[in-house]
């Protein structure tokens, strides 16, 4: 049984070849690439030597298989990745601008993942789990809200630490149910991995120093503030460690 587990989307990414390409005109694309934020996280954790597993649903198609095979090759347990008979694996089409911004078209809201609900999650799978990782972008429908809302008290009762990367779009916070869940996750998180603006947005404070103190006073043990090309900052045990980008 894995020690690090995540739940969420497994998808393929298909990328525009040219900068400033749009979806309104015919253009060349490359892919498919295995993707999905929680899948990328758990894959990297496995490559670093972690005992990892993922819970998800993919379609009975090659888009699902390219992901499943990649995860298995890198050491992720995929026994809890279910295969849908009726829905296809999610797809993200992506084009890039000169500014570095991206435009997306997602098919996730009608993909195989919508078949996952709390009743399908095998609680015995968490027998040896020490860390559970949540990506905010995975909270996209009522099923995922139900899953995380029920998992949080279950995880805490088992002494499993919760790692939270908010990684969400601002419009998510306009949905009262999603906002409530995100704040609930943050209140129960042991490890928090925000970007600089996410840190301030979610704490409601205006300085990083105040936000860090606030979170630490509420029991968040480890905070990693991501700064893109400028690296990251680790806050732990009252100490600050600035880390350069690789």
Model feature map: region roles:
Residues 9-10, 197, 238:
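Alpha-helix/helix-capping structural signal
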Residues 131, 137-214, 230-232:
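Conserved beta-alpha-beta core of the PfkB/ribokinase-like small-molecule kinase fold
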Residues 51-134:
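Conserved N-terminal subdomain of the carbohydrate kinase-like
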Residues 1-76:
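Glycine-rich phosphate/adenosyl-contacting loop at the front of the ribokinase-like
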Residues 5, 53, 162-163, 224:
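Structural detector of well-ordered beta-strand residues that form the stable sheet scaffold
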Residues 49, 75, 157-159, 219:
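Glycine-centered short loops/turns at secondary-structure junctions
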Residues 1-5, 154, 208-246:
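Conserved phosphate-binding/catalytic region of the ribokinase-like
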């Amino acid at each position: 049984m894995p020690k690090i587990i995540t739940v969420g989307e497994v998808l393929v990414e298909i990328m525009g070849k040219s900068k400033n390409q749009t979806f309104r005109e015919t253009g060349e694309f490359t892919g498919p690439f295995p993707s999905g934020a929680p899948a990328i996280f758990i894959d990297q954790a496995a490559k670093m030597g972690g005992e990892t597993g993922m819970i998800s649903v993919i379609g009975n198609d090659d888009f699902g298989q390219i992901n499943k095979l990649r995860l298995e090759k890198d050491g992720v347990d995929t026994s809890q990745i279910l295969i849908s008979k009726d829905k296809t694996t999610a797809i993200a089409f992506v084009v890039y601008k000169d500014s570095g911004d991206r435009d997306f078209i997602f098919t996730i809201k009608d993909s195989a993942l919508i078949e996952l609900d709390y009743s399908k999650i095998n609680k015995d799978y968490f027998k040896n789990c020490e860390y559970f990782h949540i990506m905010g972008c995975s909270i996209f429908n009522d099923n995922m809200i139900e899953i995380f809302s029920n998992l949080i008290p279950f995880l805490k009762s088992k002494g499993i630490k919760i790692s939270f990367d908010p990684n969400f779009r601002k419009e998510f916070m306009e949905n009262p149910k999603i906002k409530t869940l995100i704040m609930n996750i943050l209140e129960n998180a042991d490890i928090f991995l925000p970007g600089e603006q996410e840190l301030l947005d979610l704490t409601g404070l205006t300085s990083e120093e105040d936000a860090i103190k606030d979170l630490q006073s509420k029991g968040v043990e480890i905070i990693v503030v991501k700064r893109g090309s400028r690296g990251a900052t680790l806050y732990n045990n009252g100490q600050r460690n600035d880390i350069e980008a690789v």
